[in-house]
Amino acid sequence: MKPILAITMGDPAGIGPEITVRALNRKETYEKCRPVVTGDAAIMSQAVQLLGLNLQVNAIQSVKEAKFVYGTIDVIDLKCVDLLTFKFGEVQPQCGNAAFQYIKKAIELAMADEVDGTVTAPLNKEALNLAGHHYDGHTEIYATFTNTKKYAMMLADENIRVIHVSTHVPLRKACDLVKKARVIECVELIDDACRQFGIEKPHIGVAGLNPHSSENGMFGYEEAQEIIPAIEELQQRGFNVEGPVPPDSIFAKAKCGKFDGCVAMYHDQGHIPLKVCAFNWNKETGKMESASGVNITLGLPIIRVSVDHGTAFDVAGRGIANDSAMTLSIDYATRMAIYRRNKLKANCQ
């Protein structure tokens, strides 16, 4: 049986509805999974009309009512948006609240095992906070409603997968957060994630923190005191892990296939190479757009995969948004759901 995925519509004023519709207009999406949207049916219908597609929107209240057939988009209709005051491309508290409610509903469905995984379209953090929901983003919402204490963000495209020792902290503080225990935790998380993608024995590369991985202590001590001891312990436990690899070469090697996953020491060390590979320049809009990047939250009891781009208010409602990242997100979530199901069956035998 194909896995059921709950896809959140994202901020209604952004490109979330459009990229969701585009992804669900692909027949191959229904060949690998059974998607159901948590959102507003009226907004999804607007997106269908905007794109001029021959699709039907099936407004439902539960997963049991979904048809799961190509040509029909099943939407658990939460009716969060007042169409009389709604506008594309603007920060609106009602849209921030709507995006929050869509996420909350998807989490509830996954925690109740009514769906096998979740995929999220982008939200706007300003709108979210104006609505009274004070979170940094999706990841923190998921952590709160799944009661998860240890988690990490993994970015991925077709070639590179990267997890971060730290993310949204000042760079000065990030250096202090490079600790043996956290490096070990990150390798464990990305190793498990790669296995969920069907990689039997993942080869994990761990980046150094300092230039040239400190050149035997010439440019810093974090490698010798924290990173190398973590790698040695992991190797003794049987992990196929290598490092510290100089930060200026690890991602080039990963892109060429040497590593199945990488551990970055801080936010920009991991984000910059991924976005160089995953983002394209759109000449029509004069903007950068995500062609293939996805964001996967590791450590949760449920599956969460997201597009690695924002709401793109500047192009919302124009019918030109690229759905490649959404399509890839659905693919990753499907593979993870199948892996977890097979693992559960194996454990029960």
Cite the ranges covered by each PLM segment.
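Amphipathic alpha-helix from the class-I
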Residues: 167-175, 216, 318
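Residues in well-ordered beta-strands of folded domains
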Residues: 76, 154-155, 163-166, 297, ...
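Flexible loop/hinge segments that line or gate small-molecule binding clefts
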Residues: 137-162, 167-170
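Contiguous, glycine/small-aliphatic-enriched amphipathic segments in soluble metabolic enzymes
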Residues: 1-138, 181-205, 209-265, 269-295, ...
